Design a protein with these regions (language model features):
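Pol beta-like nucleotidyltransferase catalytic core
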Residues: 2-62, 67-150, 155-183, 190-311
Length: 311
């Protein structure tokens, strides 16, 4: 069956985006014959710029950060935090980062092999630690007073070298050398759960997690240390030291599957995301940008300001 043609473009991405080969392009290509053009019928944009305001077509806001859409500028949105708007779809950061299948424990999962590895106590890997991430800073010092926590990032580095970046293979290689990993989100926002949490599971270490408790909908609470379930950081650190000094208790937690029921939850579903995008793209309506009476003046000001010739 011939696919419908979709004239598409992207704007305001961070860095150089491969418009013909990225997550959303490839997802939409399952349903459409996607053609990247300068005058699209649909524009997908992020929060990193304002060029999207030059377009009067249907616009979809997409972000993997804690930003909410400006409904004066877009017709639909895919966000990593919860919003009660009917035309916004919640697709968490951790789902966009890796496949849920990576967290399913196989029937022959060998927990003992991991326990036999010569691992250190706990890892910490962050670029910065200041007043904006005070809980993370305070927790590091609270646990580090009890037993040395190895920090491989710029913040509180005490291992003699810096792990290149805080994501990717280097990160996984570093945190897989430890029994615990401090996985604190930068902020508490409804729905905001990132790869900081799930990367620890993939490294077969126990996450010490501080973040939005909506994560408990999908993740097994017996498989990690939920910092927010304790009265204070001191009480949580006491429990971590109990696990550290009780091999059987630690082994029990490590053996637990990260996902509830050891099954991939629907929140990971790319099919559901595609259904939402197709529904919004095919919706017949006047785009939000054209519903503003001052649209021509706004476009002219932006062209002058950004010196975008030929627009």
């Amino acid at each position: 069956m011939k696919k419908p043609v979709l004239f598409l473009d992207f704007a305001d991405a961070l860095g150089k985006l491969r418009k013909n080969d990225n997550f959303l392009h490839n997802l939409l290509a399952r349903h459409y014959d996607v053609q990247i053009v300068d005058t699209p019928d649909v524009l997908i944009f992020t929060h990193y710029g304002t060029r999207n305001r030059l377009y009067s077509c249907k616009k979809i806001f997409y972000t993997q950060e804690r930003y909410l859409p400006d409904w004066k500028q877009c017709d639909a949105a895919v966000t990593s935090v919860f919003t009660d708007h009917s035309r916004a779809y919640y697709y968490p950061f951790f789902a966009a980062h890796r496949k849920g299948e990576d967290l399913v424990r196989p029937a022959n999962f060998d927990c003992q092999r991991i326990l036999n590895e010569p691992r250190g106590f706990c890892s910490f890997l962050h670029k910065y630690a200041n007043h904006s991430v005070r809980p993370r800073t305070e927790f590091f010092h609270e646990l580090n007073r009890r037993k040395k926590v190895d920090s491989g990032g710029l913040a509180f580095n005490n291992v003699g070298y810096e792990v290149p970046g805080t994501a990717g293979r280097a990160k996984m290689a570093f945190i897989s050398q430890y029994r615990f990993h401090i996985a604190f989100e930068n902020r508490l926002s409804p729905g905001w759960t990132t790869e900081k949490f799930t990367d620890a599971f993939e490294a077969f270490t126990v996450p010490i997690y501080w973040g939005d408790e909506h994560a408990l909908q999908w993740f097994n609470p017996k498989s990690f240390v939920n910092v927010r379930s304790y009265k204070n950081f001191a009480e949580c650190c006491d429990y971590i030291m109990h696990l550290e000094n009780s091999p059987s208790e630690y082994a029990k937690m490590l053996a637990e599957p990260p996902l509830k029921g050891n099954q991939v939850p629907e929140i990971y579903s790319q099919d559901k995301l595609l259904e939402f995008l197709v529904r919004e793209i095919d919706r017949q309506e006047i785009p939000a940008a054209r519903r503003r009476w001052f649209w021509p003046l706004t476009r002219l000001r932006l062209v002058k300001r950004d010196r975008i010739h030929g627009e």
